[in-house]
Amino acid sequence: MNIKIIVVGKLKEKYLKQGIAEYSKRLSKFCKFQIIEVPDEKAPESLSDAQMNEVKVKEGERILGKIKDRDYVFTLEIKGKERSSEELSAEMAKLATYGNSDITFVIGGSLGLSDAVMKRSNSAISFGRFTLPHQLMRLVLTEQIYRSFMIQAGSPYHK
């Protein structure tokens, strides 16, 4: 199985890099895992709606350029469907069973995802209604992917 997370922007915080590196190492036993960073679009503090949309479109084009036709795409969206860890694990296992071995998760930039990226999505997921920094979300998502494999393996890690 190939799993990738496509994210907008660079990760700077050392403690987040260390956490992601730990889970990436653990994931290597179950899948080929990678995080792909695409550049964020530089924008002034206050933007009109049209300017915000332009930023999302440019970032969206970069994201879409990293998605392959065969990829099953989960986008992280505020209005996405909330899932438990068990539900995400079952969904990933079902995808693998039915031949979807290339899974991509997408975390947008600070303004969110473009309409084109959301349209490409096979499934929109949400980690709740609260807002998390995009950098922290990388770690949370990476841990949940690892947890999904642990649930499938019947490991006590999930308890």
Curated annotation (Swiss-Prot):
Its localization reads: Cytoplasm
Query: What catalytic reaction does the record list?
Result: pseudouridine(1915) in 23S rRNA + S-adenosyl-L-methionine = N(3)-methylpseudouridine(1915) in 23S rRNA + S-adenosyl-L-homocysteine + H(+)
InterPro entries, alphabetized: Alpha/beta_knot_MTases, RlmH-like, tRNA_m1G_MTases_N
Main location, first listed in the record: cytoplasm
Q: Which UniProt keywords apply?
A: Cytoplasm, Methyltransferase, rRNA processing, S-adenosyl-L-methionine, Transferase
What are its E.C. numbers? 2.1.1.177
* Molecular-function GO term, any one: rRNA (pseudouridine-N3-)-methyltransferase activity
Q: Which domain of life is it from?
A: Bacteria
Q: Which residues form a coiled coil?
A: none
Tell me its family: Belongs to the RNA methyltransferase RlmH family.
Record function comment:
Specifically methylates the pseudouridine at position 1915 (m3Psi1915) in 23S rRNA.
Subunit annotation: Homodimer.
Protein name stated in the entry? Ribosomal RNA large subunit methyltransferase H
> Origin organism of this chain?
Pediococcus pentosaceus (strain ATCC 25745 / CCUG 21536 / LMG 10740 / 183-1w)
Q: What is the lineage of its organism?
A: Bacteria, Bacillati, Bacillota, Bacilli, Lactobacillales
Give the encoding gene's name.
rlmH
